[in-house]
């Protein structure tokens, strides 16, 4: 049983309903997380704004891979289920890739560097080394993208 009530779209505050409709239009479903956050229209607006902003330099595959790696570190079954669904249906990742992603790796070398870094961020609570930062930058990630990897980890926590 959920500790907080998860509203249906119609039970959500009126100010949250357009945001929930947008999520449903994009994903084809409205995950429970979004419906729960909709209890606070301000929180939903902020969550959706941050999620949208992070979609500008890191592609959907990279963001979903990071979410899978972070969910595994956090041992969050709900998050793993949700991001596996999104990985398959939105990011178009295959099962082999998603299994690697959950372990903080990828078949793609550049994505692998992002995931190794993201996993270290999650496991160390953000206390990464200069060597960790240098490795992800060597893979071609700009400073702004390194920050966005960190924020994607935080968004998944």
List each model region and its residues.
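Hydrophobic alpha-helical segments
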Residues: 1-157
């Amino acid at each position: 049983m959920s500790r907080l009530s998860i509203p249906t779209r119609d039970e959500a505050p009126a100010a949250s309903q357009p945001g929930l409709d947008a999520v449903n239009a994009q994903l084809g479903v409205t995950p429970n997380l979004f419906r729960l956050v909709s209890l606070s229209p301000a929180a939903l607006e902020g969550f959706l704004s941050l999620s949208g902003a992070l979609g500008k330099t890191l592609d959907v595959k990279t963001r979903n891979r990071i979410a899978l790696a972070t969910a595994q570190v956090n041992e969050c079954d709900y998050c793993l289920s949700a991001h596996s669904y999104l990985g398959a249906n939105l990011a178009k990742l295959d099962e082999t890739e998603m299994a690697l992603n959950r372990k903080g790796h990828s078949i793609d070398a550049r994505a692998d560097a992002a995931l190794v870094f993201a996993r270290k961020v999650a496991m160390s609570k953000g206390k990464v080394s200069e060597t960790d930062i240098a490795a992800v930058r060597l893979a071609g990630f700009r400073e702004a993208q390194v920050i966005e990897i960190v924020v994607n980890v935080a968004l998944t926590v």
